[in-house]
């Protein structure tokens, strides 16, 4: 037994030299081995197996150290000029907030700085993006700067596509992918550093991840968390993580002139929104002609609420006989071959018609002008009707300023706002976090599956209202995800078999319940078609 104790001590000493994921496996194997030591006649053989596993785990880490990719930084990027400060902050703090204007280079350069700070050896550097399009584009950019093919040192994973390898150091992914990984890797031991990018968007996934990561950091002091954000209230992230340091990085910007070009007011003010929607194509065309006539040729980025509006606008501008002008769409679900056209060299003038994916997630090159109608589709949940919708709403001042910042990177720019200065001044400073305007059923279901306790005490940056929580719980009970109970505390609710199955489906719980029932009734194929339409 004394020899076995010495063996156990030797194995435990190796924990600091192997990956965090292998350390968990090694610890589990050792614990199991010690439990049966007195009864198992093959104990020596199992000790040899564990010693071999530990040696191989050590070799894997050494191989990662020896094969680190060559790191370089474009000298003209503002974030590169803060290189030493950022690397030092990452090395000396568990959480770092990096706030930077669009065009500062933070998205593509911070992962490499994490690698230089010693991350990526005993785990992967995970880098989340709100959109699949951005995850792929950023991965391609970082791999290109490192002079490597995508999928080697740098890879990406989005729904239905995994372009990573066991040798990858940096893994781009959507925040939804990281969220799904918590179900089988609750302490996220595959990672030694996590970067939450575009955190200012405050989507439901981002807010839940930031709350979840706060609990993980307490259990994993070696895990690094980097939060990158546009210059929109970075202090809220710092407060949430015990006054974590904030590093502010300026962008490469030239002066941007703002021109207000509001529509003519209708006689009946109640028809204002309808009139605006009908006149929008004419207003965009008018703004484009103004820019070309008054300021000279240049590429134009036009923000529109959604795909339908983009396709309608393409049809309208296509009939406007704009000679020498190429019109391209940009939205998250666009085919990758069409997305790549945005980044290719061209002659003449381009009009890029984009959703708010181009607001912060993607930097469209060569933009000199921006046309901003001042609207976007925002997810809203109605407690009265129990329905979530995507109405077109006015954007906040912060979003308007983000859009303005998309031009003025290659020279002085012009932003035409298709609304008045008075309208801008009356707008909200920031967009409400999605968690305050959404149905929380999916979040509550995920929390129950992860045994995270009471929703009300979970460390959200902005805690949801009690009514939202109650509505979410009631919906899940109606779907059969929870056993019926009189309690309102999540700890008092027990997931049913249906609830466990729903928590593994990456769709709204109501749609997931349709899928489960469809499978039960032998109508899965037909139900999947209906759910696909409802989920878009």
Which positions does each model-derived feature cover?
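Short secondary-structure transition/capping segments
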Residues: 464, 534-536
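P-loop NTPase motor module signature
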Residues: 1-514, 518-521
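C-terminal helical accessory/scaffold domains
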Residues: 524-534
């Amino acid at each position: 037994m004394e020899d076995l104790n010495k063996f156990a001590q030797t194995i435990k000493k190796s924990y600091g030299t192997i990956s965090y994921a292998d350390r968990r496996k090694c610890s589990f194997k050792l614990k199991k081995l010690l439990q049966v030591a007195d009864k198992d006649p093959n104990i020596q053989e199992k000790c040899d197996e564990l010693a071999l596993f530990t040696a191989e785990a050590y070799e894997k880490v050494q191989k990662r150290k020896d094969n680190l990719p060559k790191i370089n930084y474009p000298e003209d990027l503002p974030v590169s000029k803060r290189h030493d400060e950022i690397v030092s902050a990452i090395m000396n703090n568990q959480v770092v907030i990096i706030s930077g204007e669009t065009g500062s280079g933070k998205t593509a350069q911070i992962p490499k700085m994490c690698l230089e700070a010693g991350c990526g050896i005993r785990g992967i550097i995970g880098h989340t993006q709100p959109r699949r399009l951005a995850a792929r584009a950023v991965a391609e950019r970082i791999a290109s700067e490192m002079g490597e093919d995508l999928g080697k040192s740098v890879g990406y994973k989005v729904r239905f596509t995994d372009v990573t390898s066991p040798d990858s150091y940096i893994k781009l992914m959507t925040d939804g992918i990281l969220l799904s990984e918590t179900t089988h890797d609750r302490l996220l031991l595959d990672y030694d550093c996590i970067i939450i990018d575009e955190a200012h968007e405050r989507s439901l996934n981002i807010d839940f991840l930031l709350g979840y990561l706060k609990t993980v950091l307490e259990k994993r002091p070696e895990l690094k968390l980097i939060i990158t954000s546009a210059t929109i209230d970075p202090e809220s992230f710092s407060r949430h993580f015990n006054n974590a340091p904030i590093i502010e990085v300026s962008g490469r910007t030239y002066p941007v002139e703002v021109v207000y070009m509001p529509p003519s007011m209708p006689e009946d003010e109640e028809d204002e929104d309808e009139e605006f929607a009908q006149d929008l194509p004419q207003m965009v065309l008018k703004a484009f002609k103004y820019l070309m006539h008054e300021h000279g040729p240049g590429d134009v980025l036009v923000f529109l609420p959604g795909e339908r509006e983009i396709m309608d606008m393409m049809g309208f501008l296509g009939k406007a006989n704009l000679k020498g002008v190429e019109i391209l769409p940009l939205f998250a679900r666009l085919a990758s071959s069409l997305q790549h056209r945005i980044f290719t060299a061209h002659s003449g003038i381009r009009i890029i018609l984009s959703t708010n994916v181009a607001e912060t997630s993607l930097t469209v090159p060569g933009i000199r002008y921006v046309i901003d109608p001042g609207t976007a589709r925002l997810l809203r949940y109605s407690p009265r009707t129990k329905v979530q919708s995507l109405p077109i709403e006015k954007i906040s001042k912060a979003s308007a300023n983000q859009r303005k910042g998309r031009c003025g990177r290659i020279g002085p720019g012009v932003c035409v706002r298709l609304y008045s200065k008075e309208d801008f001044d009356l707008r909200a400073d920031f967009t409400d976090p999605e968690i305050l305007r959404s149905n929380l059923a999916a979040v509550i279901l995920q929390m129950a599956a992860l045994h995270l306790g009471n929703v009300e005490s979970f460390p959200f940056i902005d805690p949801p209202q009690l009514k939202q929580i109650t509505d979410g719980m009631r919906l899940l009970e109606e779907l059969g995800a929870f056993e019926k109970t009189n309690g309102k505390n999540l700890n008092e609710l027990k997931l049913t078999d249906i609830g466990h199955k729903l928590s593994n489906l990456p769709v709204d719980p109501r749609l997931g319940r349709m899928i489960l029932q469809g499978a039960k009734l032998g109508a899965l194929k037909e139900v999947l078609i209906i759910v696909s339409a409802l989920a878009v």
